Swiss-Prot record:
One of its GO terms (molecular function) is histone H4 acetyltransferase activity. The keyword Mitochondrion does not apply. N-alpha-acetyltransferase that specifically mediates the acetylation of N-terminal residues of the transmembrane proteins, with a strong preference for N-termini facing the cytosol. Displays N-terminal acetyltransferase activity towards a range of N-terminal sequences including those starting with Met-Lys, Met-Val, Met-Ala and Met-Met. Required for normal chromosomal segregation during anaphase. May also show histone acetyltransferase activity; such results are however unclear in vivo and would require additional experimental evidences. It comes from Homo sapiens. Its EC number is 2.3.1.259, 2.3.1.48. It is a peripheral membrane protein. The keyword Transport does not apply. This is N-alpha-acetyltransferase 60.
Length: 242
């Protein structure tokens, strides 16, 4: 596709689910977008198996972008990402795993990738409601374009995965990126507990607890966190590695 794409292209984009007739087109697009070769069974699954959310963005009838994701129970998360959610979440808590998100080169920077990602979020909110606590994906450590895209949409690096990919016989490193939704969060670290306690103490009036105890606790926490004023903490920011 080499046509000049107008700035108003997004207004002409339609969304629809992938179907079996799209297999050849999807194979061609994935060959252009990704260095990984997928088996034929993968293409059959994402275009017919209802466990996948497979959405195409079309422009004047042609597929110009797509997103494929699987919404599954946290018990089905692979071992390397098993700590995406804290252990206190129930076993029927769900996560959404993005297998693929791509846009035809000429149509990039027109908001189509964002539209597809937002459509996944909308789908989760209507089907999984608040049971889905995280959206995650894997990306090559060298894919700066994709990394910037996800980081600009509040995904956080959760894990570094050495030798995660095998591309044409060469092992490549990957990252796991996660977006927490509906109150989802990773396991807390010691620092998280300290920050949370600091926030709670800072919200108390010294008159409500013995003044000496308050001052000692406040000084102790400041010694752990010399770079930040505890009184300014209003919450916890989670960040890990993909």
């Amino acid at each position: 596709m080499t046509e000049v794409v107008p700035s108003s292209a997004l207004s002409e984009v339609s969304l629809r689910l992938l179907c079996h007739d799209d297999i050849d087109t999807v194979k061609h697009l994935c060959g252009d977008w990704f260095p990984i070769e997928y088996p034929d069974s993968w293409y059959r699954d994402i275009t017919s198996n209802k466990k996948f959310f497979s959405l195409a963005a079309t422009y004047r009838g042609a597929i110009v972008g797509m997103i494929v994701a699987e919404i599954k129970n946290r018990t089905k998360i692979h071992k390397e990402d098993g700590d995406i959610l804290a252990s206190n979440f129930s076993v029927d808590t769900q996560v959404a795993y993005i297998l693929s998100l791509g846009v035809v080169k000429e149509f990039r920077k027109h908001g189509i990738g964002s539209l597809l990602l937002e459509s996944l979020k909308d789908h989760i909110s209507t089907t999984a409601q608040d049971h889905c606590k995280a959206i995650y994906l894997h990306v090559l450590t060298t894919n700066n374009t994709a990394i910037n895209f996800y980081e600009n949409r509040d995904f956080k690096q959760h894990h570094y995965l050495p030798y995660y990919y095998s591309i044409r016989g060469v092992l490549k490193d990957g990252f796991t990126y996660v977006l927490y939704i509906n109150g989802g969060h990773p396991p807390w670290t010691i620092l998280d507990y300290i920050q949370h306690l600091g926030s709670a103490l800072a919200s108390l009036s010294p008159c409500s607890i013995p003044h000496r105890v308050y001052r000692q606790a406040h000084s102790l926490l400041c010694s752990f966190l010399p770079w930040s004023g505890i009184s300014s903490k209003s919450g916890i920011e989670y960040s890990r590695t993909m």
